[in-house]
Amino acid sequence: MGNKKIVLAYSGGLDTSVAVKWLTDKGFDVIAACMDVGEGKDLNFIHDKALQVGAVESVVLDCKAEFAEIFVGAALKGNLMYENKYPLVSALSRPLIAKKLVKVAKEKGATAIAHGCTGKGNDQVRFEVAIHSLAPELEVIAPVREWHWAREEEIEYANQNGVPIPADLDNPYSIDMNLWGRAIEAGVLENPWNTCPEDAFFMTNSVEDAPNEPEFIEVEFKEGLPIALNGKIMELHEIIKEVNIIAGKHGVGRIDHIENRLVGIKSREFYECPAAITLLKAHKDLEDLTFVRELAHFKPVLENELANLIYNGLWFNPATKALIAYLDETQKVVNGIVRIKLYKGLATPIGRKSTNSLYSEKLATYTAADEFDQAAAVGFIKLWGLPTQVNAQVNLK
């Protein structure tokens, strides 16, 4: 009887490379699976390295389009920002990665899935809750959480077992990156008084180094999702990639956040999210043009709930599914074009138009072209204020 098969979420870094050897020693045949969600890594290198360190099979899946359309798409439709600051960069990718891990496990006949998360962060929760939501029968193993090694011990184990040490191991920061942005933590950032050194950034210029002239872009939306950039029809993941480059050049999207983690601690996180910040602002601006007042006022309440659900690893919870269905209904009118000014760290919508626009210049103008019936205001004010007036008559004695 052969070894049991396990699918490992493989990144090519030290932790998951050591995990291949560690799991092999535990009696597993390791199938390494790497999901490309736009982190810009050399996937051929990762594929080959997995085999080099002992995986019996290496699988690389291009998930950029699905990640953009389904997961980032929901974030855009919902204007999702955890604690009104963090656009859910890592949190959005975890359920997709978990979904693909389960798919590979079922296709390969694996009985377990492994990930490289520590026991201190949010991602362990996101992965394991998602996996058990999709395949309760699968065992989940977290080698890094189990072995409790210091970094020096891990390096010693790697050297003893012929596991290559990554060239960037001396990088003091912990980095996670995908299409929607880049998360930076650890190192000097663990002291919340310290500013983030410029060498930690990759996607964005500093405001000081950003161009001294503004740049203008136009984003076209259809039912809440971008479909064109500067008049060119593109796939959503292509639009995001291009806006990351353009807005990042102008220093847009740097976020310094003291974050309340799911596991109960506060963490200090830096994010680079040029496309996320730019497209979220454009999307919200178009909603302001096309939503009735009641929807514009109510939707943010549910947006906050949905952001919390996704941050907390509950993408596959029925509540999340219901709220995303609500978002889809609201977005039917969010069609049009938004013009955005990019300059010195700011993405500012400066123009918008839509066939679903509820703005009427004839009603809003103060010129002779005004069609608003101002005489009707007298009766409206009387009825609108009637409850307050009655309360005053009864209680102000």
Curated annotation (Swiss-Prot):
Positions of L-aspartate binding: T118, N122, D123
Example of a GO biological process term: urea cycle
Keywords, sorted A to Z: Amino-acid biosynthesis, Arginine biosynthesis, ATP-binding, Cytoplasm, Ligase, Nucleotide-binding
Domain of life, source organism: Bacteria
Record's subcellular location: Cytoplasm
Catalytic activity from the UniProt record: L-citrulline + L-aspartate + ATP = 2-(N(omega)-L-arginino)succinate + AMP + diphosphate + H(+)
Family: Belongs to the argininosuccinate synthase family. Type 1 subfamily.
Protein name: Argininosuccinate synthase
Organism: Lactococcus lactis subsp. cremoris (strain MG1363)
